[in-house]
Amino acid sequence: MFKTLTQNLTKIFDRLVNSGILTENQIDTAMRDVRVALLESDVALPVIKGFIAEVKQKALGQEVIKSVSPGQMIIKIIHEEMINLLASSESTTKLNLNSKPPVNLLMVGLQGGGKTTASGKLALLLKNQNKKVLLVSLDTYRPAAQEQLAIIANSVNIDSLPIVQGEQPLDIVKRAISEAKIFAYDVVIYDTAGRIQIDNVMMEEALAIKKILNPTETLLVIDSMTGQDAVVTARSFSDKLEISGLILSRIDGDTKGGAALSVKYLTQKPIKFLSCGEKLTDLEEFDAERLASRILDMGDIISFVKKAASIVDREEAERTAIKLKSGKFDLNDYLKHMRSIKKMGGFGSILSMLPGSGKIIDQIDQSKLDSRIIEHQEAIILSMTLKERKNPDIINASRRKRIAAGAGMTVQKVNILLKQYKQISAVMKKASKMNPQNLFRSGISKLFS
């Protein structure tokens, strides 16, 4: 979501690095450029003023001016200040479950902000930490809202409180408290009703619910795609409801990203999670340093490795590596590789985590990042015989025509798949000999150009 900001900052950094020793005037110019980049990304003005002042104060210090590489030093200062802008203490960033079970978590936010989906994602994350979780919908206003949460819960085998038609929110809360004790749940997540806009009735109801539950966390789900409106929403909820933390939803959207840089600073409430995709597994624990590195085009290799480790079987990866080195990487292996990429969020998600991607993102054919391409390629490979998958070189024109018909695709798409298979085979052979940034620039990027 930080594409524009990342590209603008990267251009500024390139000029800084290439300037050699920097004068005060050059630093002033760079700070003006950074200010414009932040404004264009919808970062709130008070945040920009504070950020620029801190960076400039440190950049004008003697230790920077006399540095061997002053441009790199200023980039380091900007990185550190962005971390400070986003970060909270570890004790407040971590989800607070320190209470006698069942622990109550209250989810609040505006309608359409991703609150219900975020509730499901958080429930799944806790389930994967061996917690017994109950999901409770308190939204009796939006049609089928309770059913939506029940469907989400059922899809990941998590319990949800049975729906009683006509029951009011406070009565649902009391029934949920009783059920949670009887069935010994560790955590109960309450999804409150959202509104199209903030109003007193909404706040009064949320306050009454909070008073009964005494939750360890009151989490505000903010839609990152709403720009400056997200900041207004966050401030209103923070002032009236005493929220304990923030979940930023739709962080993967094609937006300016300013909200993510503004809400924590202006509310002084910690960002706890990033909701970064449509799947219920797409919830990341917030890490200021990693997000700052991603924004500044330094990549997020830690997130990349964590995501890969949770999806890719280690033994299978080792077998694939051996096949690559021996030149025996076939279309069965390619299919497994594509399925792993799909589970990790697709090509776009992976590229965003690699260092240096911001500099060449405009050179990439965006249509080739479409997640449907993997689905099409899967259909094509499954239309091949086992012999063809093991020996792609035997796939001649007549075989390609038959495979295309069986998959419901064009022959051109079969040709593209076979070409990409050869390219990936070649690129992956180089992987062990190159660092991630050079690999991206010289190899992987060619697949999408």
Swiss-Prot record:
CDD domains: SRP_G
Binding-site list for GTP: 109-116, 191-195, 249-252
GO molecular function: 7S RNA binding; ATP hydrolysis activity; GTP binding; GTPase activity
Example GO biological process: SRP-dependent cotranslational protein targeting to membrane
PROSITE patterns cross-referenced by the UniProt entry: SRP54
Annotated compartments: Cytoplasm
InterPro entries per record: AAA+_ATPase, P-loop_NTPase, Signal_recog_part_SRP54_M_sf, Signal_recog_particl_SRP54_hlx, Signal_recog_particle_SRP54_M, SRP, SRP54, SRP54_GTPase_dom
Catalysed reactions, as listed in the record: GTP + H2O = GDP + phosphate + H(+)
Entry keywords, A to Z: Cytoplasm, GTP-binding, Hydrolase, Nucleotide-binding, Ribonucleoprotein, RNA-binding, Signal recognition particle
Major site of localization recorded for this protein: cytoplasm
PANTHER family (alphabetical): SIGNAL RECOGNITION PARTICLE 54K PROTEIN SRP54 (PTHR11564), SIGNAL RECOGNITION PARTICLE SUBUNIT SRP54 (PTHR11564:SF5)
Protein name: Signal recognition particle protein
Organism, as annotated: Rickettsia typhi (strain ATCC VR-144 / Wilmington)
